[in-house]
């Protein structure tokens, strides 16, 4: 096979979401065509998806330093620095991208050891205040009590505006961001000095400060909600959301790659995880019409087991119930859509039969990664399950006991 045909194959693999296969093909091409800086940048993005931050930075920085002028490559480099806690380097990249609201805030934090743990080798298990409509965790923010919704669909920790001011969060620049169902919300970037989960502390976190939408707050009429705890924290650990026991477990990374389970150990591979730009958490899901499609894991979307854009209905073999509507909630507020039902849906070892979902009119995530994101997995699918996000190994595990 000639190199032109091989390149076409690599790009087709990537467009279909075959990330591991395309990585191997692009690595071969890069070895054969070392002058192709776009190949270096693509390998950097693939490493970013795999959360291999050292490799991502090496590929992307080399391509840019050798003359590549592509805003996407610079954005991916900024993200890699940001996840790694090198906030000063991230600030420089975001400034070059014109994102001055974020860049200025990160520059002020540039000399700090971001996400520093007060007990680096400790594990923590924190019970939830409630499980439905979404899991809520009681924490302390700069010493002030707070209730945070657990949401794998959020990147940074989000705090309500007035609460953040009262808690002494240092506020910086602003940007417009997009949340659930494509809803826009204005965010202010800030510096949180300490987030405490029991005796377990995480220091110097970048956070986003927003006005909590009334639609989200209305789902918790008897409990004040002060913000959202997202993947920016979860990705530092082997994170378990135990919907059975109603608790969050954070375990430090180990070299074994073995995920501890409630009744012993599970040995063997799980389902792949990827982290796209803005810490967008992706995994593989099976439906009758499509095996191993890539989906957004958004545990903070309630009101349906899953959600799909209108454009994917045919490919996924789904039919809409025209006489029914569902209402969900996310970081951007209420999400409304028509009801759809799948024959079955499988996430790792969890299989649900006849799950209800929502058809979204707007799903910006669908083509934002360079490959099709088929839809999102929500809270209702995960209820009564044990979900482990093994970020050190970039694998997802569902308990064998899921029913």
Regions found by a protein language model. Give the residues of each.
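Pepsin/retropepsin-fold aspartyl endopeptidases
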Residues: 1-403
């Amino acid at each position: 096979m000639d190199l032109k045909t091989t390149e076409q194959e690599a790009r087709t693999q990537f467009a279909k979401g075959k990330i591991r296969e395309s990585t191997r093909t692009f690595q071969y091409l890069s070895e054969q065509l070392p002058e192709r800086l776009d190949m270096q940048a693509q390998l950097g993005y693939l490493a970013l998806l795999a959360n291999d931050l050292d490799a991502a930075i090496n590929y992307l920085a080399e391509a840019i330093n050798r003359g590549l002028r592509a805003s996407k490559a610079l954005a991916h480099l900024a993200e890699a620095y940001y996840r790694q806690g090198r906030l000063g380097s991230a600030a420089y990249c975001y400034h070059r991208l014109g994102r001055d609201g974020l860049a200025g805030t990160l520059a002020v934090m540039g000399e700090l050891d971001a996400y520093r743990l007060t007990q680096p080798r400790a594990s923590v298990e924190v019970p939830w205040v409630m499980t439905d409509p979404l899991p809520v965790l009681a924490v302390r923010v700069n010493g002030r009590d707070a209730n945070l919704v657990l949401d794998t669909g959020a990147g940074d920790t989000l705090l309500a505006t007035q609460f953040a001011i009262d808690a002494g969060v240092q506020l910086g620049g602003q940007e417009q961001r997009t949340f659930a169902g494509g809803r826009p919300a204005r965010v202010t970037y800030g510096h949180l000095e300490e987030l405490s989960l029991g005796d377990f502390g995480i220091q110097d976190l970048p956070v986003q400060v927003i006005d909590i939408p009334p639609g989200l707050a209305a789902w918790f009429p008897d409990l004040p909600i002060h913000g959202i705890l997202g993947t920016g924290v979860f990705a530092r650990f082997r994170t378990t959301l135990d919907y059975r026991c109603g608790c969050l477990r954070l375990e430090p990374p180990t070299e074994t790659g073995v995920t501890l389970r409630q009744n012993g150990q599970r040995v063997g591979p799980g389902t792949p995880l990827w982290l796209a730009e803005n810490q967008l958490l992706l995994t593989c899901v099976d439906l009758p019409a499509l095996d191993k499609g890539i989906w957004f894991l958004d545990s903070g979307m309630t009101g349906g087991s899953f959600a799909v854009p209108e454009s994917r209905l045919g490919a996924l073999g789904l039919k809409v119930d025209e006489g029914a509507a569902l209402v969900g909630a996310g970081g951007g507020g209420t999400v409304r859509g028509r009801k759809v039902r799948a024959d079955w849906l499988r996430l790792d070892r969890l299989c649900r039969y006849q799950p209800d979902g929502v058809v979204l009119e707007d799903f910006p995530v669908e083509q934002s990664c360079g490959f099709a994101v088929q839809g999102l997995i929500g809270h209702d699918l995960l209820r009564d399950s044990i979900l482990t996000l093994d970020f050190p190994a970039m694998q997802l595990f569902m308990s064998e006991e899921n029913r």
